[in-house]
From Swiss-Prot:
Its EC number is 6.3.1.5. InterPro entries: NAD/GMP_synthase, NAD_synthase, NH(3)-dep_NAD(+)_synth, Rossmann-like_a/b/a_fold. The gene is nadE. It comes from Helicobacter hepaticus (strain ATCC 51449 / 3B1). Pfam families: NAD_synthase (PF02540). Belongs to the NAD synthetase family. GO terms for cellular component: cytoplasm. This is NH(3)-dependent NAD(+) synthetase. One of its GO terms (biological process) is NAD biosynthetic process.
Amino acid sequence: MKHFVNPCIHFIQKQLQERGFKKVVLGLSGGIDSAVVATLATLALGSENVRALLMPSLSSNEEHFNDAFNLAHNLELESKIIQLAPFQENFAKQEGMDLSGKYMEKLDMNQKMRMGNFCARIRMTMLYDCASADNALVLGTSNKSEILLGYGTIFGDLAYAINPIGGLYKTQIFAFARALNVPQEIIAKKPSADLFANQSDETDLGYNYADIDTFLEAFEKLGGVEATQNKEREHIKEKLKNAGFECNMIESLSTRVWNNTFKRTKPTILEYKV
């Protein structure tokens, strides 16, 4: 994966030059994706031009926060800690949510998802405010697997100016992280969006990333991402079945990709002809 390093560095440098910026800002969660992007940005621009925001929520894993803090320190990044608790408490009060308990266990699953998405959008608000204050661009940290599956919050973590890793599947990110010497404790941990306590990507998605990415590669090669007609979609499902993928996986993951198309496209605008 070392051959990806220079193209990613060049991409960041070129995008900033073309847009007239010198600095970037990103959210640093302690996860592997943001660690890879922070490392790439530092290599591309120098640590003095990269700012990291650490934005833990009430249910954030302390280990994740510590990993983010240590990485920012090791990369010599200017960093800022923004606690999301006050925003969450106000939101919960308005919506009648009970936040008592260490891990918000009194919230039902729908409320947990709403709170998680709310936090993702508050984080992006903070990132864009910081970008405005610093005359910087917001860097995205979503990988290709997440983007295709819609596993992210629209106008939350899926909102950014540029993204150097959005063309890499999650399994490629792991290899990339090792090539960049990202700390092993970050590489080894279970992938988690940290939307609520004890949440993990692979539990949510129902499959491990190795299997997911194998499926997505085959799905994409068959034109599945662009398929819009039911007949075409059924034909793709049949081909995937013949390729050895089990029916439940085909149905689950293809439905995720198709149902979340709106997250990958610009808002639809009705155009009037004069």
